[in-house]
């Protein structure tokens, strides 16, 4: 699927599990709300920002993307010139530009801030899209960077992680107390940890729905930004080209990918809106 979910959520899931272990070892009492909030905040935001800070390295390593330092051909020269022009128009620093091997038509942007980003495109995109269509895709990715989508996503995920950690322990303590007959609450038996683990999984699903809703919202904004930088008709043409190429992506995540989630995915868990909705939104917009 064309998603940005797997690595990012895997990192945050690992943090949730680690938080459970560490808080248990440190004896953090779920009845001590201040201590719980502090620990949940540290672990909740920790995973998000570690993932964000490592996002460029992870993206390069997982896709095999090669950064263009000295253009070797006309295509690479065009890529650098186009990204430089769009970055200047968007008011951001020049991102690193990379190409990775992949048959799918796709591109992504990632990085910890607006002036230290990475924009990469697949060889499938370069082989199957016209320059006008590719220009629109690059504009879409530059818009992600200019909008600060990566840092905003990390902040949102940090809040959601913290919420999941706290709520799972508070509700888990209540359930464990009710089951054990301990009216003072805060049971620390094996059942308590099982309950908390299950609740983290359940609440984590709801948190994922929220983060994916935000992801879909930001795709519309990035489409509008791409239309402003490259032209609305070019942006529409790029999306229409994607409709003709529904191949499966091998992209990992924590990257702002241009594609869409697989057609079999439930809409609540889709990181991108359906292509027809994105095209309709562009047709209804006032961007030239």
UniProtKB/Swiss-Prot annotation:
InterPro entries xrefs: HtpX_protease, Pept_M48_protease_HtpX, Peptidase_M48
Entry keyword annotation includes Ligase: no
Regions that span the bilayer: 5-25, 34-54, 155-175, 190-210
Membrane topology listed for this record: Multi-pass membrane protein
BP-aspect Gene Ontology terms: proteolysis
GO CC annotation: plasma membrane
Pfam families linked: Peptidase_M48 (PF01435)
Chief localization: membrane
Sample GO molecular function, one term: metalloendopeptidase activity
Cofactor: Zn(2+)
Domain of life (superkingdom): Bacteria
UniProt keywords, alphabetically: Cell inner membrane, Cell membrane, Hydrolase, Membrane, Metal-binding, Metalloprotease, Protease, Transmembrane, Transmembrane helix, Zinc
Matching CDD domains: M48B_HtpX_like (cd07335)
Enzyme type, top EC level: hydrolase
HAMAP family the record matches: Pept_M48_protease_HtpX
Family classification: Belongs to the peptidase M48B family.
Protein name, entry field: Protease HtpX
Organism: Stenotrophomonas maltophilia (strain R551-3)
């Amino acid at each position: 699927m064309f998603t940005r979910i797997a690595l990012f959520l895997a990192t945050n899931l690992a943090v949730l599990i680690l938080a459970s272990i560490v808080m248990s070892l440190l004896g953090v009492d779920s009845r001590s709300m201040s201590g719980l909030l502090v620990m949940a905040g540290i672990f909740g935001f920790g995973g998000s920002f570690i993932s964000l800070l490592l996002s460029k390295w992870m993206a390069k390593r997982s896709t095999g993307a090669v950064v263009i330092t000295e253009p070797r051909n006309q295509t690479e020269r065009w890529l650098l010139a186009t990204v430089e022009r769009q970055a200047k128009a968007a008011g951001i620093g020049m991102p690193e530009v990379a190409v990775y091997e992949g048959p799918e038509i796709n591109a992504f942007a990632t990085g910890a801030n607006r002036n230290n980003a990475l924009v990469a495109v697949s060889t499938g995109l370069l082989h199957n899209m016209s320059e006008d269509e590719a220009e629109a895709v690059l504009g879409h990715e530059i818009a992600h960077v200019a909008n600060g989508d990566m840092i905003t996503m990390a902040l949102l995920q940090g809040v959601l992680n913290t919420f999941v950690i706290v709520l799972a322990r508070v509700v888990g303590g209540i359930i464990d107390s009710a089951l054990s007959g301990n009216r003072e609450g805060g049971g620390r038996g094996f059942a308590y940890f099982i309950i908390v683990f299950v609740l983290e999984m359940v609440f984590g699903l709801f948190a994922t729905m929220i983060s994916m809703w935000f992801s879909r919202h930001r795709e519309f904004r990035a489409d509008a930004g791409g239309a402003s930088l490259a032209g609305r008709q070019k942006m529409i043409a790029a999306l229409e080209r994607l409709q003709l190429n529904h191949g499966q992506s091998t992209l990992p995540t924590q990257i702002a990918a241009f594609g869409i989630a697989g057609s079999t995915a439930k809409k609540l868990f889709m990181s991108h809106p359906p292509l027809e909705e994105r095209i309709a939104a562009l047709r209804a917009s006032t961007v030239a």
